[in-house]
UniProtKB/Swiss-Prot annotation:
Keywords: Ribonucleoprotein, Ribosomal protein, RNA-binding, rRNA-binding. Pfam families: Ribosomal_L4. NCBIfam families: rplD_bact. SUPFAM superfamilies: Ribosomal protein L4. This is Large ribosomal subunit protein uL4. Disulfide bonds: none annotated. Gene3D superfamilies: 3.40.1370.10. Part of the 50S ribosomal subunit. Residues 60-71 have a biased composition (Basic residues).
Length: 211
């Protein structure tokens, strides 16, 4: 079990919260998280790149010029890969890049990644509840009060982000906002600081604490 200090909106200590998740063995943790990140990045690829082979290029039924007497190399079709506009040899075709990974492994990788970043976790009580209208400055000032470096990549995890908070955060280049049910290994490992609401921490414990 790990304990986290809970801060209020002004950055002052407001209590403590605990998080207890089962993690991978130290010998396999890095490999497990690496495979989870590879799978996530592979699944984000569209796989729609496509080129025409010589069989698919239009035209080419007529011999471009006679066989002999021109001084040039013989050509039988304009669809040959040797000519500009001809077919492509071994070019890309639509395919899926998806990688298989067991559900238990995916959940274990997620729990391991979160617990590995526990030193960078900042838990906030009632995150942004005082905002009555979208204010980017309010969010950036709050992050400074919470001790987040100005140039840090920040991942904010809320139970159910409100539209006010979404609009307040979207103009901050290095700040990403996700819901607690959108947790993923890449975002957890990519960010320098993780800012969680108290409700999001409880939801994570509820969803991932039983395994």
């Amino acid at each position: 079990m790990a304990e986290c200090v809970v801060h209020d909106w002004q950055g002052k200590e407001a209590g403590k919260a605990s998080l207890e998740l089962k993690v991978s063995k130290e010998t396999t943790a890095v490999d497990l998280m690496h495979r989870a990140v590879l799978r996530q990045q592979a699944h984000s690829r569209q796989g729609t790149a496509s080129t025409l082979t010589r069989a698919e290029v239009r035209g080419g039924g007529r011999k471009p010029y006679k066989q002999k007497g021109t001084g040039r190399a013989r050509q039988g079709t304009i669809r040959t890969p040797l000519r500009p506009g001809g077919g492509i040899i071994f070019g890309p075709k639509p395919r899926t890049y998806n990688l298989a990974m067991n559900r238990k492994e995916r959940r274990l990788a997620l729990r391991t990644a979160l617990m590995a970043r526990l030193e960078d976790v900042i838990v906030v009580k009632d995150f942004g509840d005082s905002l009555k209208a979208p204010k980017t400055r309010e969010i950036s000032d709050a992050l400074v009060r919470l001790g987040v470096a100005a140039d840090a990549k920040v991942l904010i995890i809320l139970s159910t982000p409100s539209e006010i908070i979404r609009r307040s955060v979207r103009n901050l280049e290095k700040v990403k906002l996700i819901a607690a049910d959108q947790l993923n290994v890449f975002d957890l490992l990519h960010a320098n600081s993780l800012v969680l609401s108290e409700e999001a921490l409880a939801k994570i414990q509820e969803v991932y604490g039983d395994d």
